[in-house]
Swiss-Prot record:
Signal peptide residues on this chain, from the entry's feature table: 1-46
Keyword set includes Signal: yes
Keyword Signal in annotation: yes
Gene3D superfamilies named among the record's database cross-references: Periplasmic binding protein-like II
GO molecular function, one term: thiamine pyrophosphate binding
Keywords: Periplasm, Plasmid, Signal, Transport
Disulfide bonds: none
Originating organism: Sinorhizobium fredii (strain NBRC 101917 / NGR234)
Classification via PANTHER family: ABC TRANSPORTER SUBSTRATE-BINDING PROTEIN, THIAMINE-BINDING PERIPLASMIC PROTEIN-RELATED
A single GO cellular-component term on record: outer membrane-bounded periplasmic space
Homology family: Belongs to the bacterial solute-binding protein 1 family.
GO biological process, one term: thiamine transport
Compartmental location: Periplasm
Protein's UniProt name: Probable ABC transporter periplasmic-binding protein y4fP
Amino acid sequence: MRNVIKLTWSRRKRSASLDKGENIMKLAFAFATAAIVVAAAFPALADTLTVYSPQGGERGAWIAEQAKAAGHEIKLLNAGGGELYDRLIAEENNPQADVVLGMVDTSMALLKKEGLFQPYSPSWAKDLPAQYKDAEGLVHKFWQTPIVLAYYPDRLADPDAPKSWLDLTKDDYEGKYVIGSTAAQTTRMYLAGILVRFLDADGEVSDEGWDFLDRFYAEGIIANDADSQLEAFKSGRASIDLNWLGGALKRADDLDAKVQVIDTDGGTPVISEGVAIMAGTDQLDEAKAFVDWWGSADVMAAYAAKFGQVPVLPEALAKSPATVQANAKLVNTQPIDWDAIAPKLDSWLQKIELEIRQ
């Protein structure tokens, strides 16, 4: 049954009818105003922030849980660094990610070159050392991982250990070190660290560098996977480990042996994982808030306490456990311009596969 307001030309009834119409208009306006107030007080919930990251397993779960506790609803898409890189390139015209987190220097440099990131200076960036942020303000790095040269003192006396990566081709070390697959991030990074020592004036690897790498492969133990690498150490053949710091410590634990990290002449390659906001995100405010939270000193220190990773933010390192602070001082960093070598690395690795690695 409908309520109908009948308008008549009687002065009295017309007045009464208009009063009713005015009341309805006022009521409608009141409801509209109330709706606006409610909308302001309870804004629509933002969509979940999509974060692409190689951090998976326990580490990925920790990131997601801590982010949620801090008020950030994220969906963490986890895959290997190479797979994520390919996916981001494939999605360039229809980006699905809002934030990229935890990819290494070379990958971030190439993605940046493709124009996939937008500038943003996080709240913690002002205290970040210069080598961990780019001039464009696109990528900011938050922890570092040394790619170390280490040895087992029960197999190789301290005075006999190599002093430099370039010592490995000496006769004393033939058959004592293991070279992994070029598909592995660690292998790629120490090969880059070796080759940049032989760059000519044009930034290309000299013949001397390729000759060195020929000898390096000829005298090493080539093992494509973790099991065969571990077996080379278990058998007693290998005594020198070319590994990321955490991997070297884990391998020593698996072998129930002591390992010694070498602070090499010429420095140690150190890779850093970064964070960046995608240029195509439609959740810019949420992405900025997440990046501010993620790289903050308290979050980085908590991650360091949980997983032993060394943060690069000085305040975060100061709040980290003593063992993490000690690991930060183990080696001197080899100066490497990752942005400069990133576009060249794949061609170097291809040459190694086709012409050197047997």
